[in-house]
Amino acid sequence: MFFRIVRTLPLILAAIAASSGSGLYAQTAPVRVAIIGLEHGHVTGFLHAFPLQHDAELVGIVDPSAALRAKYEAEYHLDPALFYPTLDALLAERHPEALLVYTSIGEHRRIIEEAAAHNLDVMVEKPLTISLDDALAIRRAAREHHIQVMVNYETTWYASNRAVYDMLQQGRLGEVRKVVIHDGHQGPKEIGVQPEFLQWLTDPAQNGAGALYDFGCYGADLMTWFMHGAAPITVTAVTQTDKPQIYPRVDDDATIILRYSGAQAVLMPSWNWTFGRKDTEVYGTKGEVVAVNSTQLRERFSESSPEESVTAPPLPAPEDTSLHYLAAVVRHQLDPGHDLTSLDTNVVVVQILDAARESARTGRTVTLRPLP
């Protein structure tokens, strides 16, 4: 099952009502959320989506930069009273139930540990963090304080990826043999990301690497989900910088090979694609499927049959958007378990990325050890 939903009659009725458009979720008090950080460009997506939903109430925004606070206040016509320079100042007055983190990836551990001390659930942008040591520290804090830590990926909300997962679960593809995942775009500078976003994306101390971490995490997340949380046996990676004049400190192209018992995944994160892409190919013993984009699939089940194009069914609420999902988790209506956003899945993702970075550095294949 994609997400494990608590099996009680009221919650089943709520899910049915939400999917039918009756607005029952909207009648529940919205979850009080605060934004931490404005230096991650994905915050704009939240601010655009926020007025169109009823699951979350924005009660505060924290960023130490007065210039960034003023920029977003003006651009989104936000109440100046929402803005705070520190998390402590916000917590003293606003009492959020959950935090949405839009800082550099390198700041995630510190913020999650602070949130855990206040028993606040957290959703961060992908990836979870920049090193396995940090990921394990985050897991310790979450377990000690009994909080949920979720990782938001655009591809989690792709109906096509859910359809691929369901095909695997139903056995329609047979046993998985090879998965090829392409993620990336022309480059952050080339597509015009905000200056504050570009500054830390190209700093290995804050982003972990370049394209290797920025887009390698998508494929690692999907493959870990497809493999029911299992880590690969080995990780082999090659990175290069094809545009050193733009990205002198980090890689802009990578290939990562994950070896499992009986299967292999090839992840191709890059800041050098001709166009933006997030597509996945899965090859099994009975069939193959390509998730072309967020909704479209190409599938084929025998050598003699032609490839067919199909549209994936839409995701049901509350599995359809990040805020809908977050609200359900905070309300204890949904348990992330070992799914795409879950902490357990994403500790494995960081284990893969950490090993890939080491493999690229040394030129050697890295054998993974069991997590503590």
Whereabouts are the PLM-identified features?
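Beta-strand-loop-alpha-helix segment that lines the small-molecule cofactor/substrate pocket
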Residues: 98, 104-105, 109-156, 171
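C-terminal helix-rich "cap/oligomerization" subdomain common to oxidoreductases
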Residues: 28, 98-100, 328-372
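Active-site loop of classical SDR/Rossmann-like NAD(P)-dependent oxidoreductases
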Residues: 41, 291, 312-324
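Contiguous beta-strand/loop segments that form the cofactor/metal-binding neighborhood of enzyme cores
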Residues: 219-296, 323-335, 355-356, 372
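N-terminal Rossmann-like dinucleotide-binding module
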Residues: 24-77
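Predominantly a Rossmann-like dinucleotide-binding segment in NAD(P)-dependent oxidoreductases
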Residues: 156-246, 363
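Conserved SAM-binding strand-loop segment of SAM-dependent methyltransferases
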Residues: 80-86
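Bacterial N-terminal signal peptides
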Residues: 8-20
